[in-house]
Amino acid sequence: MLSGLVIVDKPQGWTSHDVVGRMRRLAGTRKVGHAGTLDPMATGVLVLGINKATRLLTYIVGTSKTYTATIRLGETTITDDAEGEVTEARTAAHITDDAVAVGVAALTGPIQQVPSSVSAIKVNGERSYARVRSGEEVKLAARPVTIHRFDVHSITRIDGGRVVDVDVTVECSSGTYIRALARDLGNALGIGGHLTALRRTQVGPYSLDQARTLEELAEELEVLEMSLAARSLMPNRELSEQETTEISFGRRIAAGPGAGTPDAATAEKPAAAFAPSGELVALLADTGSFAKPVLVFAPGTGTGTGTGQAK
């Protein structure tokens, strides 16, 4: 059974669910999921899991993300991006490069961010975007996010400065809305702002260099095999034959070298355990002097398919 990750370069106009549906047909299985939604207008890295690899997705969702984006200052939209109608316009002619830099700096580091109201966040069981589209005014609670990097690459004045386009790179924690960053930068400058372009270039350890378009995947389905996917995602632990046998049957073994330290493997941040053959056997968490399996992938005594890239 084919199992592994597929790194897709999502096309503009497709929902993440659309891409999952396409991959189900390409892989010949219903068991396909993704590790974090991309808005339809956005392009770039969308990590999919096939069959057993869907169990890795929960550990990818919480990783940092990197984006390139264009923020338009001087116009506010109902969706905080170019998909929505412009609700307010103010001239950006007086906005200097230094003012943009100050605004960006204030939005870098740990911040409290109010998500865009047109989002998939549920309010009393209903998606926020559905409430907004029905005419309801939705106010979402702020949540903590971290903007690790917010770099300005270029500032372009259009129509004599009526609007200003700012090209940026953002590296951020999971749960950050780049649309909300655009909105907040515009609001801080007193002229409003929204997102006009967004491309995700990295999700955790998986980058755009590894991504393939749906057309390329239709010609050759390139799958990152489970062992390789886990090795790049989390700390590794190499097992002996005896340890492999114990873990394969759900039994505990001696804790890893990081036990009792901040580097200890936990259920939320486990270590990937590999048989001598290189096969991914399980994900482990250290509890006291023992390590126990959080997930077991491979039954048996340590023989396996090794590592490699399945196609």
From Swiss-Prot:
CDD domains for the chain: PseudoU_synth_EcTruB
Any one GO MF annotation of this record: tRNA pseudouridine(55) synthase activity
Record region (Disordered):
237-268
Q: Which catalysed reactions does the entry list for this protein?
A: uridine(55) in tRNA = pseudouridine(55) in tRNA
Q: Which UniProt keywords apply?
A: Isomerase, tRNA processing
Has UniProt tagged this entry with the keyword tRNA processing?
yes
Into which family does the record put it? Answer: Belongs to the pseudouridine synthase TruB family. Type 1 subfamily.
Query: What role does it play?
Result: Responsible for synthesis of pseudouridine from uracil-55 in the psi GC loop of transfer RNAs.
Q: Which PANTHER family match?
A: PSEUDOURIDYLATE SYNTHASE TRUB1, TRNA-PSEUDOURIDINE SYNTHASE
What protein is this chain from?
tRNA pseudouridine synthase B
